[in-house]
Swiss-Prot record:
Keywords: Fusion of virus membrane with host endosomal membrane, Fusion of virus membrane with host membrane, Glycoprotein, Host endoplasmic reticulum, Host Golgi apparatus, Host membrane, Host-virus interaction, Membrane, Signal, Transmembrane, Transmembrane helix, Viral attachment to host cell, Viral penetration into host cytoplasm, Virion, Virus entry into host cell. The record marks 473-474 as: Cleavage. GO terms for cellular component: host cell endoplasmic reticulum membrane; host cell Golgi membrane; membrane; virion membrane. This is Envelopment polyprotein. Glycoprotein C and Glycoprotein N interact with each other and are present at the surface of the virion. They are able to attach the virion to a cell receptor and to promote fusion of membranes after endocytosis of the virion. Pfam families: Bunya_G1, Bunya_G2. Coiled coil: none annotated.
């Protein structure tokens, strides 16, 4: 017993086991029929889990779903976090239904972002707990306090640094490639040694490669394989043998080559061996020596280490000359429309007018071309048969071979009274001295006369055509009908005069129709609302018209409808048309009783099949005259069928007129009306048959007892509203609307009343206004569509759209106000008043977005809640401690109820959540050199701002290679007028070319530098969705004890459903359930993803942008060009000569500020691969087949375990590629992808220099000069100098300095005094820098910065120093030349200091002495001996003679 008690005590003392974590606080509970599964997740600041605790009551079993959170970063609230899209703190939030989703937050505490350029570290500083994230080429994140540093180690860093609410994106490059440094940092070497090794890596590689080749050759020399090198050494040995035999002095003792420092050898060059020098000399002098053996020497070289070492050096140099360094290789290289709603209103109106004139233009076009073709045909016929045409005016006389005018012509046999007198005016005398010959001029006057008549007729036809086109429509008699008291037959729809009908009227909205009718004075301004309310479709318009209970109102609406569809009744002229479909279908779908008995009668065939309609009148008059006798019911049915068909054919006023005739039993008037319709449309056979049938039925005796259908009574007009005051209030109006006003800019309304007025034209009730204020002088305004709201500050005041009184009441026009004053009006209670209730407001909410917005005319801090309502909130950072993460107070301390703001009032929002701003590098161009000095000497090494001297800002980092170019244009006595130069530059970012501009005589005049500052193509991408790995699964499930699973399982948007039947069994059922192999477990699920990757789709076509700059010594200017449009200015003429076309991928992914391309799913596509789970607007979408299991508990509900919901193939995203040449610029909601490493083509440039009067330049010039320089040594920006030169004449001056100057020659003019130079110094020049301009020596003051930055910041689309260096120096030997040899000599320079010159002189002297002794002296001695031999030979020859 004691043991049992001890066991119970121990068991009770042990803590209760809890899954996931112990303790924690409940953040939300949700009793529901559906249970959630147990989920345990971790975010950046906490852990959260969900549990389902079942509760049973009288109505069933319910689940108390609970969410519990435990903080891991307990003080994260100190950084004042706020929600923002793309934030770097991931927090799991709990929804009202306990569904979990991931949200992004950032801290609101202040944070300073900087970059230490001397240590290549990002510096972050804050006063409290804060969080940072670095994304891009370096990815790091974490929490910190005070100050932290993040070291950069990539050669070129493309980064987005985020700390608190600030984000900055920039591009930074080191002054050397960092792959070597990163590799050595992983070893035991100290950082300084690693940096030194990498700085000298080129010479180290050269020496190492030389040693490796030497070792290889030394090993090969031990074997016969070394003789493979003989083809290399044989030419060398042969050349040496030639030089040996012919050019070297011989030793007097042995006969070999002179060897002052060694003894005579025993081996001859031919291979023979002698013991003494005398025998060797005898062998050489007697001619027995065959000479130098090149093959033997080559074999010796193959085995010797000396030639091997020389060969290794040469081979290493050759290899490194043609091999590109790995560090400098670049990996991965290898339209405007407008929517209709975007157009302004005047353009839309213009489009409508164009449509209205379209038919007229087509008609005019057809008639004009017809006239043209007719004129051409007449011209061709006239040309071919012109004599027949001209025969009208003149005749040809064969007797006298002349043409005679027919006017006054008289014949005398074969002769006429005008013989010997031609139409051309020439006479022929009887003597035959003047003989006439028929020529072209004889009939020219008649041709002209005929052409004149033809042109007159042609112009007359054109005038008739144009006059017919511009002819206006006739007037309308609609106004006459409005003046009648009651309806007449000629005031019904078919008989209204609509004037000229144009088909484009159908495209006009009823608003335009109302405007047209008001312009014709046909309606009042108070009638416009009833016309604009007509539905656009014909069926709806006819129903709307028939609903009108007053003749004048119905006539007005019908006339408006017929004005729009002006061919509605003209379609009745024949047997088809869109307006006849309804009544013809109605007839064919209903049968006449008589036709059932007599189907072959002509009338019945006409009604059913459209046959025999012309003989239908005598048919039923003879064949069916006895059918209706004693059959009143059948008579009534058939006549009602015919009248109903007529009703469907003629709706509106026609049907109302027929209804009035039927109610009055005015059968004669009815038949007269139908006969008028038949007379108006004589070609409509079926309509004629129906009307004749109605007339026939009227003549039968059964007509006296005819009962028409009840619907005709609904078409009768009601009494006039003016005579029935109960339509308004039942008493006289207490408001004096004669004194009504309608003021503008009124936002509040007291005593709001509805107003009804009668139109003076149609009598329609005009109820589009409300009245405010006192009855004696009410203010009337347009009736709001959304009602009025009670003000939140004064309950007696009413506002529009919301309770804040921000919207102005719309004043009515003066025309409407005048009509109201002249009309009879009543006030009635306004029904659409929304009183203020506390339930409409809120003290706190889960924030969706926050920021500052334009609210009406004010700038308010606004918070958008998760229910998409907007509230005024001045804090936006105060948490509601009674709620979970994400709930913010709308007022300080959540004490005041705030009411929502209508979204219409909100505009131009600077959202902090959905549209976070990302800063860029600030580039400041400083115009004055003194200000530039001040800017760079402040040592702002941690600033993200760049300061550039304006006059040299467009120069490259490295001095370009110059080429000579000659000026072109007209040469004069003074020089060249309008001079220019032409050249071509590759469109590659960072390319620079220097031009040494010469005159045509070859005289160097000045230097100009062309620099491609940026060259890229880019596109803008819009975000589609986010994706990421699945971190958990949201689940809701339920179970049934018995029965099948539901056919349709309720689920939320984006959730997948699952179900399994026959889940109830013994030991696996809830309490009270007794079932075996029955029941169901079902539910829905959704993945919880961690957003790691965002997918974007291309929204714009590729845009190519190139910025080309020209820099002189006194000015600089740039131009932006594209492949389409050439640039022509006073300074530049630039265009693309060749264009390379590239394209960016359609869909890209962005992860950690890095672009990834590959197989990525589009929005709404869920195929296997990256992006088949998509989060859009806070909802996760995907597809798949959920997999789940359940655990059974005795007398309890099952524990559902969902193992998989969506098919998430996020692992495929890890195989996406990251192009090295792409750069990324993030903006609010979009990104811009830029490729800047492609050659976009070739730019043809024409630089206009103006008038260069170089022939007047002086050779010597007096210059008053001073200079000022600022910059740094061995840095990115180098030294910038401003020279102030004063001279009275123009001159071309060379520039000389101890440092490297970018411009070697400048033009000096009297009008320009400020000149700028960029200078590169490798050594500190002292307090002044000596610059020589022409013959003037300038001691420019120096302001040097001691900082040694190793990293350079640059805008995203511009190149850095390391990039230009790689482009300039692409081989290892180039690196050795620029850096290696200098590095070798650097230790000696540091050792000897200022005496380095003496040391270099000593070394050079020793080398020169050795060359003299071993090279020059033997050659000189050989030359001396040769000259002596020639002299001895000369003396011997002279003795012989």
């Amino acid at each position: 017993m004691i043991r049992m008690l001890v066991l119970i005590v121990v068991t009770a003392a042990s803590p209760v086991y809890q899954r996931c974590f112990q303790d924690g606080a409940i953040v939300k509970q949700n009793p529901s029929k559906e249970a959630v599964t147990e989920v345990c997740l971790k975010d950046d600041v906490s852990m959260i889990k969900t549990e389902a605790r079942y509760v049973k009551n009288a109505t069933g079993v319910f689940s108390n779903n609970v969410a519990i959170r435990k903080w891991l970063v307990s003080d994260w609230h100190d950084c004042r976090p706020k929600k923002i899209v793309g934030g770097h703190i991931n927090v799991i939030e709990v929804g009202d239904d306990l569904s979990l989703h991931t949200e992004s937050y950032v801290c609101s505490a202040d944070c300073t972002i900087g970059v230490d350029k001397e240590t290549a570290q990002v510096r972050l500083q804050t006063d409290t707990t804060n969080h940072f994230e670095i994304a891009g080429t370096t990815v790091k994140s974490g929490w910190f306090k005070s100050t932290t540093y993040i070291t950069l180690d990539q050669t070129c860093e493309h980064l987005k640094v985020s700390c608190a609410p600030k984000s900055v994106q920039f591009h930074a490059c080191f002054n050397q490639h960092m792959s070597c440094v990163r590799f050595l940092h992983r070893t035991i070497l100290p950082g300084s040694i690693a940096n030194s090794i990498c700085q000298n890596i080129e010479i180290i590689i050269l020496v190492t490669l030389t040693l490796l080749i030497f070792i290889l050759l030394s090993i090969l020399s031990k074997t016969y394989i070394c003789y493979l090198l003989m083809p290399i050494f044989i030419p060398i040995a042969y050349m040496y043998g030639v030089i040996y035999n012919k050019s070297c002095k011989k030793c007097k003792l042995c006969g070999l080559v002179y060897h002052p420092f060694t003894e005579c050898g025993t081996h001859c060059v031919c291979g023979a061996r002698y013991d003494t020098s005398d025998r060797m000399k005898l062998h050489r002098a007697s001619g027995l020596c065959p000479g130098y053996k090149s093959l033997r020497a080559a074999r010796v070289m193959c085995k010797s280490k000396g030639p091997a070492s020389i060969l290794s050096i040469i081979t290493a140099v050759l290899v490194l000359t043609f091999v590109t360094p790995i560090n400098s290789m670049v990996l991965g290289e290898s339209k405007e429309t407008f929517e209709l709603e975007e157009l302004p209103d005047d353009m839309l109106e213009m489009a409508l007018r164009i449509n209205s004139y379209y038919f007229t233009c087509i008609l005019n076009y057809a008639v004009s071309w017809g006239l043209i073709i007719a004129g051409l045909l007449v011209g061709l016929i006239f040309k071919k048969y012109q004599h027949r045409f001209l025969n009208i005016y003149a005749m040809y006389c064969e007797e006298c071979n002349m043409y005679h005018d027919k006017s006054g012509l008289k014949r005398h046999g074969d002769f006429t009274n005008k013989c010997r007198q031609c139409t051309c005016g020439q006479y022929e005398d009887a003597t035959g001295l003047i003989t006439h010959r028929k020529t072209y001029n004889c009939l020219v006057q008649y041709k002209a006369k005929w052409m004149m008549n033809f042109l007159i007729i042609y112009i007359f036809l054109i005038l008739i055509k144009d006059s017919a086109i511009v002819g206006q429509a006739t007037g309308t008699d609609f106004t006459t009908c409005l003046e009648t008291e009651s309806i007449n037959w000629n005031c019904t729809g078919p008989f209204l005069n609509l004037g000229n009908c144009q088909k484009q009227q159908k495209k006009e909205p009823y608003t335009n129709i109302a405007t047209q009718l008001k312009g014709l004075k046909a309606i009042s301004v108070l009638d416009i609302p009833i016309i604009t309310s007509i539905p656009d479709d014909i069926a709806g318009a006819l129903r709307y018209i028939e609903e009108k209970e007053d003749f004048h109102v119905q006539l007005t609406t019908e006339y408006a409808m017929l004005s729009k569809y002006c061919d509605y009744y003209t379609q009745f002229s024949d047997n088809s048309g869109y307006s006849q479909t309804t009544w013809r279908v109605y007839l064919r779908s209903h049968d006449f009783e008589a036709c059932i008995l007599y189907p072959n009668q002509h009338f019945c065939k006409c009604v059913k099949n459209g046959e025999k309609c012309s003989s239908s009148n005598w048919d039923f008059a003879n064949g069916m005259k006895n059918y209706y006798s004693g059959k009143q019911a059948k008579f009534d049915k058939d006549l009602n069928l015919a009248l109903t068909a007529l009703h469907h054919a003629f709706r509106g006023t026609s049907s109302a007129y027929i209804a009035a005739m039927l109610s009055k039993k005015s059968n004669d008037d009815l038949i007269a009306y139908t006969n008028k319709i038949k007379a108006k449309f004589p070609g409509n056979a079926l309509l004629k048959a129906i009307i004749d049938y109605i007339a026939y039925m009227k003549g039968l005796p059964e007509m006296a007892n005819f009962k028409y259908d009840e619907f005709w009574d609904e078409l009768l007009y009601k009494p006039n509203p003016a005579k029935a005051s109960n339509l308004a209030r039942g008493k006289e109006s207490s408001y004096n609307f004669k004194l009504a006003i309608s003021s503008k800019s009124i936002k509040t309304c007291k005593n709001v009343k509805d107003v009804a007025c009668l139109s003076p034209r149609s009598g329609a009730i005009y109820s589009s206004i409300i009245a405010c204020g006192e009855p004696n002088g009410p203010s009337v305004y347009r009736k709001p569509s959304g009602g009025v709201f009670q003000s939140s500050t004064d309950r007696s005041i009413y506002c529009l759209l919301d309770s804040h009184c921000l919207e102005e009441f719309e004043a009515i026009s003066q025309e409407e106000l005048d009509a109201v004053k002249k009309s009879k009006c009543w006030e009635i209670e306004y029904p659409d008043v929304r009183p203020l209730q506390e339930s409409d407001g809120a003290k706190s909410c889960r924030m969706k977005d926050s920021g500052n917005c334009n609210v009406a005319t004010n700038r308010w801090p606004v918070m958008q809640c998760e229910n998409d309502k907007f509230y005024y909130s001045e804090l936006q950072k105060d948490y509601d401690k009674t709620q979970d993460i994400g709930h913010y107070c709308l007022s300080p301390g959540c004490t005041t109820i705030r009411y929502p703001i209508n979204p219409k009032h909100i505009s131009n929002c600077n959202w902090q959540v959905s549209r976070s701003s990302i800063a860029k590098i600030d580039v400041h161009n400083v115009e004055d050199i003194e200000q530039y000095k001040k800017a760079i000497t402040q040592k702002l090494q941690t600033s993200l701002s760049l300061f550039k001297y304006a006059k040299t800002k467009n120069l490259p980092h490295i001095r370009p290679i110059y080429k000579y170019i000659t000026m072109k244009e007209t040469e004069t006595a003074e020089g060249i007028e309008s001079a220019y130069i032409e050249s071509e530059v590759p469109a590659l970012a960072g390319t620079s070319v220097g031009f040494k501009i010469n005159s045509k005589e070859g005289k160097h005049l000045l230097d100009v530098i062309a620099y491609v500052k940026s060259a890229s193509y880019s596109s803008v991408y819009a975000k589609l969705y986010s994706t990421g790995p699945t971190s958990g699964i949201n689940t809701k499930h339920d179970e049934l004890c018995t029965g099948p699973c539901p056919a349709n399982i309720n689920h939320q948007v984006g959730w997948l459903t699952f179900a399994r039947e026959r889940t109830s069994s013994w030991g696996c059922e809830e309490f009270g359930c007794l079932a075996v192999s029955d029941g169901c477990v079902f539910g829905s699920c959704q993945d919880i993803i961690k957003e790691e990757l965002s997918v974007y789709r291309k929204e714009t076509e590729e845009v190519t942008n190139v910025e080309l700059c020209l820099t002189f010594s006194d000015k600089t200017y740039c131009t932006n060009l594209n492949p389409v449009t050439p640039i022509i200015t006073d300074l530049f003429e630039v265009q693309f000569k060749t264009v390379e076309t590239y394209s960016l991928p359609r869909i890209v992914a962005v992860q950690n500020h890095e672009i990834k391309i590959g197989q990525i799913n589009d929005l709404g596509v869920y195929s296997k691969g990256c992006g088949n789970v998509q989060k859009v607007n806070g909802t996760v979408y995907g597809n798949g087949v959920p997999r789940f299991d359940y655990l059974c508990h005795l007398a309890s509900r099952k524990e559902v375990i969902v193992r998989k919901c969506f098919d998430n193939d996020y692992q495929a995203c890890k195989f996406l590629q990251s192009p090295a040449s792409y750069r990324l610029e993030e903006d609010s909601g979009t990104v811009t992808i830029i490729d800047y490493k492609k050659i976009l083509g070739t730019i043809k440039m024409k630089a206009i220099l103006g008038d260069v009067k170089y022939k007047t330049f002086a050779d010597s010039v007096d210059i008053t000069a001073e200079g000022s320089c600022a910059g740094c040594i061995n840095c990115f920006q180098n030294i910038h100098c401003e020279l102030t030169l004063h001279t009275t004449i123009e001159a071309s001056c060379p520039i000389k300095s101890s440092c490297t100057v970018f411009h070697d020659r400048i033009l000096v003019t009297p009008n320009e005094h400020k000149y700028a130079l960029k200078i590169v110094c490798t050594e500190k020049p002292g307090n002044t820098l000596t610059i020589k301009v022409c013959n003037t020596r300038i001691e420019a003051s120096m302001a040097l910065v001691d900082a040694k930055p190793i990293i350079e910041l640059a805008p995203v689309d511009q190149t850095a120093y390391i990039r230009e260096k790689d482009e300039r120096c692409k081989t290892w030997m180039c690196r050795v030349r620029d850096e290696g040899l200098q590095v070798i000599l650097e230790p000696f320079k540091n050792l000897f200091g200022s005496y380095i010159g003496i040391f270099y002189t000593f070394i050079i002297s020793i080398i020169a002495l050795l060359v003299i002794i071993y090279v020059l002296l033997p050659i000189c001695f050989k030359l001396r001996d040769t000259l002596r031999k020639h002299d001895d030979a000369y003396k011997r020859e002279m003795k012989i003679r």
